Amino acid sequence: PFLSGRQQPEEENRLSLSPITNKHIMKDLRTRHTALLLFTFLLASVSLSAQTGLQQKLSEISAITETQPLESTEFSEKYVTYFTQPLDHRHPEKGSFRQRVIVAHAGFDRPTVIITEGYGAAYALKPQYREELSRLLNANMVFVEYRYFLESTPEPKDWRYLTAESSADDLHAVTTAFKNIYPGKWIATGISKGGQTALLYRTFYPDDVDVSVPYVAPLCYGTEDGRHEPFLKKVSTDEDRKRITDFQL
């Protein structure tokens, strides 16, 4: 009787505390649930805000079907994108291909350099790559791989669409789209065949860019130019020229 008398108040205390304890537990669960919802909302907000910059703007260009981030020691952001281009810009119904375009970001208020590459763009993927004018002007960089080279090769390869005018049409489409992101001054530049491409781009679309800077721009007179042969027939010695000819054959 003595022990049962001492146990009874403890049981009563437990029973009397139970509603309070349950209330605290429910309140704690509601607090945790609210905190979890708030954290989820903040996380979603951060993810959304992370894409309100260049990446978000790239996603708004309908011609871009794929965007991948690239490492860069020169720019705050760098991406390789794949831009849908018609094989024939005058007749889009004839098909399309994906053109590789590399974008490097210096600032929305900065000028933009479009590199009119004459061949492939693989070297521009390197983290340390930065074109000279882009460095000098602290400018954005839009690097366009030439059609029918590397990852910008149509399938099947219908060579009728590999023309200077089609290349200029490609550059015009890229520039027009990216001016929605970079509305400042634009500079077109290229080296060798890329320089030739910059000149031809200016010829077909004289108002697309503010400045054209071709670094070397060989302009051919035709499929057979006619200016190289006289020089090659005289340079060096007969023996050396034959050796080079034999090596090529």
Where do the PLM segments sit?
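Short glycine-enriched nucleophile-adjacent loop
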Residues: 195-206
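Alpha/beta-hydrolase active-site loop
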Residues: 161-179
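A catalytic-pocket lid/entrance helix-loop region that shapes and gates access to the active site
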Residues: 209-249
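Catalytic-loop region of hydrolases
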Residues: 51-140
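Alpha/beta-hydrolase fold nucleophile elbow
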Residues: 182-192
